[in-house]
Amino acid sequence: MGGFHRFFHIRMRLRVLYHDHCFDGAASAAFFSRFIRGKIHPDAEFHYTGMAHRASQIFEDSLFDGDENAIVDFKYSNNEKLTWWFDHHQSAFLTPEDALHFQTHPSPKKMFDPSFKSCTNYIRVKAEEIWGFTAPDLDELVYWANIIDGAQYPDPKTAVELGAPAMKLTLVIEGSKGSDTVQRIIRYMQRMPLTEIVAQPDIQDLYRPLYERHVNSMGIIREQADENGGVITFDLTGYDLEGYNKFIPYYLHPEGTYTVAVSPSSFRTKISVGSNPWSPVEPSHNLATICERYGGGGHARVGAISLEPGQVDEARRIAAEIAAELRS
């Protein structure tokens, strides 16, 4: 019996909750996994759960089923089973009580800094600063997470025409159904350069129809979008475009400073609020603060509000209010 116990080994089970259908969310999960395996738990077994913003956002206790549990690039939870947390969104807390819980329960494994352009880079900096972990082979991943999540593209053409492998991968991450594809990509990201990931047959099979959909979405938004007073508005009710490229409006209307769009899906009715990174007029409104008034959030330059499925009329009312405020 002693021999059995000596050789029998149960691997650490680590559950990672990440922002689903988001390049930075996937890259954050990948970098975090490499960090944990490289510095904390070398034999950890990773399980991933994609998280999406919903109107009634709650963290079910059953989500935290690991020996250790992590949330990356997504909102804070006060669940006692949460071990690790990294986020960079201004709107990182569901309630004031959650913010107070974070402040009064300090942990070196739970960190928040909205000054970072990407959560991936935030994890990279803290992993090196505190634990001495580095992964030079993931520098490309961190670089593109900063570009994509921080909207650091040189021009709308780069953001929309998808020339770089990272942009092609973003199309697949944002447009694929369910979470299985994104979770495969998270595992690929830990060991492959982006060019190699995009060349994988399973990714190519998804990319081709998604690219056709991307081209079609440009035509739909061209028809639906209207620019007035520096605000581009459009309503995608009736179209399956939940994962459309958010820079298309500025590609089509470079004179616009902001966008406000309504896009229903199976699990929410979404109001997207964004600002043009290349605008000739400097955006002056904090979009996260505006969205927070309606139960949403985000960053200063980009935010969103999630209502229940079917609340299209309410979404249109809110969108009109926000558009009027942005024109003022």
Model-predicted regions and their roles:
Residues 152-244:
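Glycine-rich, Lys/Arg-enriched anion-binding loops that position phosphate/diphosphate groups
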